[in-house]
Regions:
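Accessory carbohydrate-binding/adhesion or oligomerization-edge regions at the termini
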Residues: 1-78, 177, 181-183, 306
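Structural motif
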Residues: 140, 294, 362, 390-391
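Accessory beta-strand-rich segments of carbohydrate-active enzymes
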Residues: 2-9, 16-17, 33-34, 48-54, ...
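Conserved, mostly hydrophobic/aromatic
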Residues: 142, 211, 356, 392, ...
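Surface beta-strand/loop "capping" patches
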Residues: 218-244
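Substrate-binding/catalytic cleft of secreted carbohydrate-active enzymes
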Residues: 433-639
Length: 639
């Protein structure tokens, strides 16, 4: 665990040292809702930046910044901390180059340069931001198009009308203004600190995930909610559009059933029926009829990842099947149920991460996605001990605490291959789980966990005012020795005196679940960590359960357990390992070890933070082997 206290030393990854500024994180940013490659423009790269004391756009900018790296990151080229009393500005001119624009626009216009005023009324431009920390406003040609608060969540906005009314024939100006209070406010901040030391690290700010411009039809698919049921082998799916045209009742029919002898058309009520399925054609319109094509499952672990950064898209899972054997019709903006019994039934596991790819057509729109059949549950074994189960079989989850910090990019990986390397390396070392620690990654990280077979425990990002270390660290550690907790009603002790801050945390928790819930690799939601900003734990646990009952919940990782959720979550860095009273929940040791070894040329400061310094790798291995032996002895008793 490294302590980073500023910009004294620069430490680069192999990928960061060789980064191509013209091809930065160029992979498709949203694998769970993928349109054709010619439907979007990646806006990563060189932007102008400026720091100001005023909230007014600067007349002059300070220089160039490499987006999406935060100005505090070495790879940004800036190496400057945004302070709470400052504003950070980004700006670039987006040029309508014939080589940049989607092919459909090229064909429609057939002119050069592109004339924004002749853009078809049946098309929309959507600008996407993967994440901007913490609060931002977005401007197109000086006109504000949206604001967003929440430094870890994606957002987008339709800029079509602004472009039509203000853009020139060849370009438009895109400006982003950022305000980041870091750890001086109640907003979500993770482990960021303006005074990094110990377990808290360098604060970063601004744009830190991909920015991209997408071209979509007038009526388009905004999101897909996929809820596969492992036990019933049924896929519940909802295709959410930007249209207000919704229906409550729907039955579907497959292509195979259409051709079957018992499939017939009743002309009187324009109804097609076949077997158990019926589709009411009089309820369908050109704007709400969807076509879902599902492929048989396959494993995509061996997608090549040794290409150059510019070519390494890792999206080949959508190209393996030339056609989908099963097709279903339905209506958008309402849940439909699709039995999967006519497909090959393959369960997702870390060893066999089968994925079902599928496509959805809605009018002129076409997207691709995937799902998996798996279920995570807590079930009792023959000795009446609660166990974490995958597909109703106990699975011992051996994981690492993945904090998602990069020495050269901070929150932002230098490239997609770096994410893959991390996941594959952990698997090669015998780990089958990563606990994503109080950070939300870009969507491609979860996609790689899905296809590579890595289980994820997802933390909610902590927030609240300044924490009281004597309470949430020192006293809590001592109390854990005796399995003592306390009520979370004391908002002043838990840094939760702000009512707005409490509401914001609940809102962002629900948004996190909404954003990530389609990823099959995610097994658990971790609501609070070590009492940081903890409040109303059992109430929030119920809200999380209502939002997603397909995963188990660790409501309080470490200490201040309120007796709810599915996990008795233990942190133990200092004491002999043991289990306490018998639980109806599963026991999990969710943090331990923390041993450190300084490796020459692999540290950014002269200090190292951890829970036991090791002189060499031999001592480090010896300590971990001793700890693992203790852990193994507790597995039969419930760990």
């Amino acid at each position: 665990m490294k302590q980073n206290s500023g910009f004294e030393k620069k430490l680069y990854t192999t990928w960061g040292r060789n980064i191509d500024k013209n091809n930065v994180l160029t992979e498709y940013p949203r694998p769970l809702l993928k349109r054709n490659a010619d439907s979007y423009v990646n806006l990563n790269g060189i932007w102008k930046y400026a720091f100001t004391a005023s909230n007014k756009r600067p007349v002059r900018f300070d220089g160039d910044i490499l987006v999406p790296f935060s100005p505090e990151a070495h790879l940004s080229g800036v190496n400057r901390q945004l302070k709470p009393n400052e504003y950070l500005w980004y700006e670039r001119i987006v040029t309508f180059d014939i080589n940049m624009l989607p092919r459909e626009i090229h064909l429609f216009q057939n002119i050069y340069p592109f004339d924004i005023n002749r853009l078809s009324d049946n098309s929309r431009f959507i600008i996407h931001f993967g994440a901007v920390d913490q609060i931002c406003s977005v401007y197109v040609n000086g006109i504000k198009v949206c604001s967003h608060s929440g430094g870890y969540l994606p957002f987008d906005t339709d800029i079509t009308d602004i472009l039509k009314s203000t853009a020139t024939k060849t370009s438009f100006r895109l400006t982003v203004r950022v305000k980041d209070f870091s750890d001086t406010s109640y907003h979500a901040r993770g482990k960021q600190s303006l005074n990094p030391k110990g377990m808290f690290y360098t604060a970063q700010s601004g744009i830190w995930q991909t920015v991209w411009l997408e071209y979509v039809p007038e009526i388009y698919i905004k999101k897909i909610i996929a809820k596969p049921d492992f036990d019933t082998k049924v896929l519940r799916i909802k295709v959410v559009t930007n249209s207000d045209n919704t229906e409550n009742n729907f039955y579907y029919i497959s292509e195979a059933e259409k051709k079957h002898d018992n499939c017939q058309i009743n002309k009187n009520d324009t109804k097609i029926s076949g077997g158990k399925s019926t589709i009411h054609r009089n309820r369908l319109t050109k704007t709400n009829e969807i076509k879902v094509c599902i492929n048989n499952p396959d494993i995509y672990i061996d997608i090549p990842d040794d290409k150059t950064q510019a070519d390494s898209t890792h999206d080949e899972l959508y190209k393996d099947s030339p056609y989908a054997p099963f097709t279903y019709y339905g209506i958008s903006d309402t849940f439909i149920e699709i039995p999967l019994d006519k497909l090959d039934i393959k369960a997702w596991t870390p060893d066999t991460p089968y994925l079902y790819t599928f496509s959805v057509n809605l009018g002129k729109d076409y997207v691709q996605s995937y799902f998996a059949l798996r279920t995570f549950t807590i079930e009792k074994d023959a000795n009446d001990i609660p166990r974490i189960c995958l597909n109703h079989r106990p699975i011992f989850q051996k994981g690492v605490l993945d904090q998602g910090y990069w020495p050269d990019g901070l929150y932002t990986p230098p490239c997609d291959n770096a994410l893959i390397y991390d996941i594959k390396t952990m698997k090669s070392l015998g780990f089958n789980m990563l606990r994503k620690h109080i950070k939300i990654e870009n969507d491609r990280w979860y996609y790689h966990c899905d296809r590579l077979g890595m289980i994820v425990w997802q933390d909610m990002v902590n927030s609240g005012s300044r924490y009281k270390s004597w309470f949430v660290t020192y006293l809590a550690t001592f109390m854990s020795l005796f399995d003592i907790s306390c009520s979370d009603n004391f908002n002043h002790l838990f840094a939760r005196t702000s009512k707005k801050g409490r509401k914001e945390f609940i809102k962002e928790t629900m948004q996190t679940i909404d954003t990530l819930s389609n990823h099959p690799s995610i097994a658990a939601w971790v609501i609070f960590n070590e009492g940081w900003g903890q409040f109303e734990t059992n109430k929030i646990t119920k809200l999380v359960r209502k939002a997603d009952n397909s995963r188990f919940i660790d409501q309080a990782s470490g200490w201040f357990d309120q007796g709810g959720g599915d996990i008795k979550s233990i942190h133990n860095y200092f004491f002999p390992l043991r289990l306490f009273k018998k639980e109806n929940r599963a026991y999990a040791l969710t943090e331990y070890g923390g041993y450190t070894q300084i490796i020459k040329h692999h540290n950014t400061t002269n200090k190292c933070y951890g829970y036991g310094d090791c002189k060499n790798s031999k001592e480090l291995k010896r300590r971990y082997k001793k700890r693992e032996k203790e852990i193994s002895s507790l597995i039969p008793h419930g760990l």
